[in-house]
């Protein structure tokens, strides 16, 4: 083959490789997620808004129902920790068995967040909240009616999965219903009221068990506390479905879009890329991973310690454990207000 032929072949090969490299670069560019600067994010630089005004814009109904549901969920959630010694004696099982079931209940709560979040992205959310809350009430009743530790385990499994709607479904409903400028204070108020119920729950569940009397008085705590959750579940079905991302669209475009339009799919990678840039999220995730395994068993063991060392009954254990949940409540109002102020200027 002549030198000219070899040169033409080499030139053709180089051209093909260059075209292929350009094609791959174009494909990569098309798939590359764009992360906008902070000052272009929805809500940044907006005017300050009073919490009451923000709640009025979205309607008080959604906030009231979801906050009440979260509060009663917290009330029931403390029962197994406070009443653990009585439950163990009823079923004739060890402290370790009830501690395991208590810790597993927390794991079930986290486990249910994924499936319910998947549903919340694809369906109307009010029916999910109503159905999950109703199931939570049913499993709470069945927990009180448990005949052995094996049944108790599976009833807590069902209760934990259904309660998980408060993690993923509640938060998205609130975010889409109320303006960006009040979300910090709104979530602080929502969480504060729920945590207040959680702080008082040891006293309440202990009082119900003490009032019912007897070795199996603990069952009545589950029976009684399931009633308001069941009632609120029916109110949850009436929660109006807000347009997804309506306040973000309004802030960026000046108006929300037609809710009947097909939703643009969200890139999970882009969402995580944006969220993981927030220092608070990174630090909190690492801290929870480090502390979680130590904190969860501690809540279940406290009641056994108080009963064995000091002979406290259910009501007395409730009074002893209640103060441990009050510290957070002192700071939530300030944290919520500070968040709203900071987000408008430095969201990262």
Model-found features: residue ranges?
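Extracytoplasmic
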Residues: 61-95, 298-303
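Cytoplasmic helix-loop-helix junction between adjacent transmembrane helices
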Residues: 155-194
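Extracytoplasmic gate region of multi-pass secondary transporters
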Residues: 80-81, 278-332
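Helix-breaking motifs and short loop linkers at transmembrane-helix boundaries and internal kinks
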Residues: 92, 124, 145-151, 162, ...
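Central cavity-lining transmembrane alpha-helices of secondary-active solute carriers
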Residues: 103-117, 322-335
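Juxtamembrane intracellular "pre-TM" segments in multi-pass secondary transporters
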Residues: 43-56, 243-285, 309
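Helix-loop-helix hairpin linking two adjacent transmembrane segments in secondary transporters
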Residues: 190, 194-244
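Conserved MFS/SLC helix-loop-helix module at the cytosolic interface between two early adjacent transmembrane helices
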Residues: 111-150
